[in-house]
Amino acid sequence: MAQLSSQGNNAIIYLSYAFMLATGLFLAWKFSSNKDFLSSNGTQRGIPLALNFVASAMGVGIITTYAQIANIAGLHGLLVYTICGAIPIVGFAVVGPVIRRKCPDGFILTEWVRHRFGMVTALYLSAFTCLTMFLFMVGELSAIRSAIETLTGLNALGAVIVECVVTTIYTFFGGFRVSFITDNFQGVCVLLLLIICAAGMGSYIEIDTSKIGPSGLLKANKLGWQLVYILFVAIVTNDCFMSGFWLRTFASKTDKDLWIGTSIAAFVTFAICTLIGTTGFLAVWSGDLIVGDENGYDAFFILLSKMPRWLVAFVLIFCIVLSTCTFDSLQSAMVSTISNDVFRNKLHINYVRIMLILIMVPIVVLAVKVADNILQIYLIADLVSAAIIPSVFLGLADTWFWYLRGFDVMAGGLGALLGVFIFGTVYYHSAREGGKLLLIWNGLYDSSDWGPFGAFVIAPVGGVIITLASAALRIAVLYAYSKVTGKEFTALDKPVTVEVENQDHTYGSIDDDESDTKKVV
């Protein structure tokens, strides 16, 4: 690697963090208020939303995860990953207005769940939501640590701690409003990084065209087809756990702005992740790696080693900016979720800020001590979301599933995770391996191992089946109880909901006809 001196690297790292701190504090002083600390509903137009969704969908981890899949499953696997990562962003424009019709004063998914299924179910979903964001924060710190150490050869512990301190300080004062603005900055940085790195790689990397055909990286493959299902289910459901996406969905001024923002973001995310991922097979064609190389996740940095030092320094700066903005978004989203779901936004803003500081301690410890496999961290969160989210979303269709209650949803989600364990135990003939499957211990990229595929089938399908079975059993028990006691049977009564309209939106069910919805001013 064409590295700078340790003094030069340290200067770049800590001056970059100082710049981000100064920028964040200035934005907090200029734009923040207690009103916007947790959310900014109905304030944002399409283009700022697009930049925010792009930034929320990315972190430094994209540099390694997409290159790794490209090195293993070639163009087929890479396109599957990037398409599956982009399409769910548009899903917020589809589902977001429906959620807002039902819960116009909320700003995250769990608030609608509280209205539909009750407090206990909302806390259940909130716990898994916070767990997901916790894992993503650990993954992001692990990713920036790996990036800094690879680019500089330095121990990145100090940089990781400084990043946490920097984002905590300006998020402490600015909250969601500052996070939203820094995400716009991050979106621009990602585009600049892409343009400069693409130009650099085009100038300094030599491709041996004789290796392209024999590598087989441009052909369809079994793993690529397996990932079509696995990654789509994993990413669609996991995005629903990311409160940062919901905060931005509710921040849209109109549904049209939401459609514009998510559509642009989906396309840009697809393009950026695809181009970054191509380093996985470019490194093979340049002779630096082999197909399925154990260092495939480092393909971007391996190619970067062929470039001049100024370009390495540039990439280091933008990795820091990218990670800092991603991390502050996760911080803001987690604090907003806890404040809303646990304390009902009644906690004094200073206590919310203290909570922001406290959650950093375990995250830093885990990121430094135990988080080595970034992709596996994400996959654990993906499997949990695949088990829980489908049964929750049945509650959007009141015409068909009005009889579902919170108990059914919780039984479905937890039962699905138990089902994955049972499947793994049977498939691998070992309870130990069944437990490992819950953690996706063996990864996704072994096409001969159908365990992960089965897990991502059992999780959503099993969750829905168990939810419906739980509802049927509960209704049957209540019916028998009403017959025995003579009490009124109400288990199949449709819940009465108040339809509310906010701004130019109509709020109701996913299957409501607009002509039947009453406008309330």
Swiss-Prot record:
It is a multi-pass membrane protein. The chain crosses the membrane at residues 11-31, 47-67, 79-99, 117-137, 156-176, 187-207, 227-247, 264-284, 310-330, 354-374, 377-397, 406-426, 453-473. GO terms for cellular component: plasma membrane. PROSITE patterns: NA_SOLUT_SYMP_3 (PS50283). It is found in: Membrane. It catalyses: spermidine(in) = spermidine(out). GO terms for biological process: cellular response to metal ion; cellular response to starvation; filamentous growth; filamentous growth of a population of unicellular organisms; filamentous growth of a population of unicellular organisms in response to biotic stimulus; filamentous growth of a population of unicellular organisms in response to starvation; intracellular pH elevation; spermidine transport. The keyword Amino-acid biosynthesis does not apply. Belongs to the sodium:solute symporter (SSF) (TC 2.A.21) family. This is Spermidine transporter DUR31. It comes from Candida albicans (strain SC5314 / ATCC MYA-2876). The lineage of its organism: Eukaryota, Fungi, Dikarya, Ascomycota, Saccharomycotina.
